[in-house]
Amino acid sequence: METKTLFDSAGQLYQQTHIAHWDAVARKRDSWNGWGGHYHRRLAEIYRFLITPGQRILEIGCGQGDLLASLRPSRGLGLDFSASMLERARAKHATLEFVQADAHDLSSIEEPFDFIIFSDTINDLWDVQRALEQLRHVCAPSTRIIFNFYSGLWQLTLALAQKLNLAAPMLPQNWLTPSDLRGMLNLAGFEPIRGWQEILWPLPLGGFANKFLVRLWPFNEFALANFLIARPQPEPVKEPTVSVVIAARNESGNIKAIFERTPKMGREMELVFVEGHSRDDTYAAIEREMAAHPGSSSRLFRQTGIGKADAIRLGFEKAKGDVLMILDADTTVPPEDLPRFYEALRAGKGEFINGVRLVYPMGKKAMQGLNFLGNKFFSMAFSWILGQSIKDTLCGTKVLWKKDYGLIAANRNYFGDFDPFGDYDLIFGAAKLNLKIVDLPIRYRERTYGSTNISRWKHGMLLLRMIAFAARRIKFV
């Protein structure tokens, strides 16, 4: 394989040596498996959790293509510089495409992918930053790049395993730390989303260690594999359209303020009201204000199901905007704050903008003490489970792209219908899609009309069950 146009003489020698090495490893694997099968099967399990079937996937350093094939892509392209590896990959996985190419030069690839995988590849590269820079033209704005790479703590253990012929031989590695890779990603135009550790015991009978202990400190510090997910640094979106969805139940006295106080955002904006079996005249109040504000684009739907989550889903289904916003009808989150959420999403600061009530001091009656402590506990628990900081899980104001909500809804059966609020349905779904979640602090105000529709103790117990559920479905998998 020609490398003289990419590197100086030292780089060329490095590449030639590594190509010859991996060609030899490919031939060796025809009659030898070692003990690495347990490790690679666990890697495949992790990637199948991260990537749903039917995605467009590029794997760089694909070897014999087993990981790529296990993900059932709609379009699977594997790249490797070892001709011997690719010969075997094509024989094993005829439905996938395999191309001999160098990770440092992807100019021959002219299509974007949903996911790009570097599985135990990054530590074997001559110039990591250059390889990362090559990714820009094969990325869409929503592309996710997933890396897994050995921890430097395992250098001696892996060297011993190779000497005992239990693991495939490796040439000297870069032994990057997660911090090293984050820095290089930033230089290459990418933004890390989250990182974590996997696999304590890459041998038989490792289930408990690899699915439970590795999630806990201090055991996670000794894991074999570092994982990191990144996205392209975003470009601002110019003037998207906006739908503000308001679920209203027993909020008649707040409707006028919503019409009068909600600022205009985006190229076009609509208010989408979903009225939920009110005991007061909320529905009629919305109709009156719609008639009184003919210049506002607004629509009203009567909820057929029960609960806020059901109302929000109906509103999102009916919404026409590119951007979906939730505004609580009690206006305890001021409508005047919505442009901050809009701008954070439009500018690419995050893909799921989550309101936070717990940063600024609150009004005296805005949130009772037990509710405040409960929200603090739940935010800490869910931040740990999801791997991204979420300071307030039950602030009603959340903003995301409609296209991303469509993906959340399409994958909702993974979690099931468990959330009466709708907050966790969206948060879990966003985390499962590896969306960038960003907290946006707001000042939480006192109610000026009505009383809360939340039953503190009943819903608190439900949320405890949801923590256990989320831990099983997201953390300990």
Question: Which functions belong to the PLM regions below?
Answer:
Residues 129-144:
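A short glycine-rich, Lys/Arg-flanked "PGG" loop and its adjoining helix->strand segment in the class I
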Residues 2-5, 210, 214-242, 246, ...:
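Hydrophobic helical membrane-anchoring modules
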Residues 2-52:
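Conserved class I S-adenosyl-L-methionine
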Residues 117:
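A conserved beta-strand element that flanks and buttresses the S-adenosyl-L-methionine
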Residues 154-169, 174, 303-318, 326, ...:
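Acceptor/aglycone-binding surface of glycosyltransferases and processive sugar-polymer synthases
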